[in-house]
């Protein structure tokens, strides 16, 4: 089926393709789409950069489509420094985790709002953790932050480990990688000012994402580490 005319889109990734074309991965409300951009060294090629909201028309019925029309739509989210690395991280998560051509309009909207917030200079960590959690939720990988795997309420004085396939499990013995109940309850309320909440959220999201990302390291994470 032909793709809708004039759908909003962002560039997630691009690379040279044949002599004068580019192979571009787009993120649209209808999902992650891959398409060939002909004459990529011309006017259209100047728009192939991340964080620019585009109006896009794709042609073709197969998985590899062709860019029929592409125009800038609105103001780009200009990201610099750590905000730029954060934006690249979001793009890499979407490239690695989103199935091709599966609609995720809620993720698209959250992504747009997150880019705007990054451009405004808002604190990075809450934005990244919120996006990671929304992505897990929309993909069906989320788990309860207020109840454990036995449907018992998370206890503020309890210790928990994450079982990625089931959720949070209370444990009695200290071991690496545990989470305090009081931190989990803060995360359930998105209370980023609570002591230890941001660090716990970072550890929790890293554990939750790892099994879905696989063993291949994230390039954006390495860039952030070496900045």
Swiss-Prot record:
Organism field: Pseudomonas putida (strain ATCC 700007 / DSM 6899 / JCM 31910 / BCRC 17059 / LMG 24140 / F1)
Protein family according to the UniProt entry: Belongs to the RecO family.
Protein name: DNA repair protein RecO
Function: Involved in DNA repair and RecF pathway recombination.
InterPro entries: ARFGAP/RecO, DNA_rep/recomb_RecO_N, NA-bd_OB-fold, RecO, RecO_C
Keyword Signal applies: no
The keyword DNA damage is annotated on this UniProt entry: yes
Highest taxon listed in the record's lineage: Bacteria
């Amino acid at each position: 089926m032909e793709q809708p005319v004039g759908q909003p889109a962002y560039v997630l990734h691009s690379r040279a393709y044949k002599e004068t074309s580019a192979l571009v991965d787009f993120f649209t409300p209808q999902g992650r789409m891959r398409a060939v951009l002909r004459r990529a060294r011309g006017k259209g090629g100047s728009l192939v950069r991340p964080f620019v909201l585009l109006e896009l028309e794709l042609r073709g019925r197969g998985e590899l489509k062709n860019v029929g029309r592409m125009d800038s739509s609105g103001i780009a989210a200009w990201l610099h420094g750590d905000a730029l690395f954060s934006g690249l991280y979001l793009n890499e998560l979407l490239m690695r985790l989103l199935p091709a051509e599966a609609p995720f309009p809620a993720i698209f909207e959250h992504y747009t709002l997150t880019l705007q917030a990054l451009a405004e200079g808002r604190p990075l960590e809450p934005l990244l953790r919120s996006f990671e959690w929304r992505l897990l939720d929309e993909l069906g990988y989320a788990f309860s932050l207020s109840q454990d795997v036995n449907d018992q309420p998370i206890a503020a004085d309890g210790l928990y480990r994450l079982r990625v396939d089931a959720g949070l499990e209370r444990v009695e013995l200290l071991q690496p990688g545990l989470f305090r109940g009081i931190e989990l309850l803060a995360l359930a309320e998105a209370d980023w000012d609570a002591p230890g909440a941001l660090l716990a959220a970072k550890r929790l999201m890293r554990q939750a994402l790892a099994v879905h990302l696989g063993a291949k390291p994230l390039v954006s994470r390495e860039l952030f580490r070496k900045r």
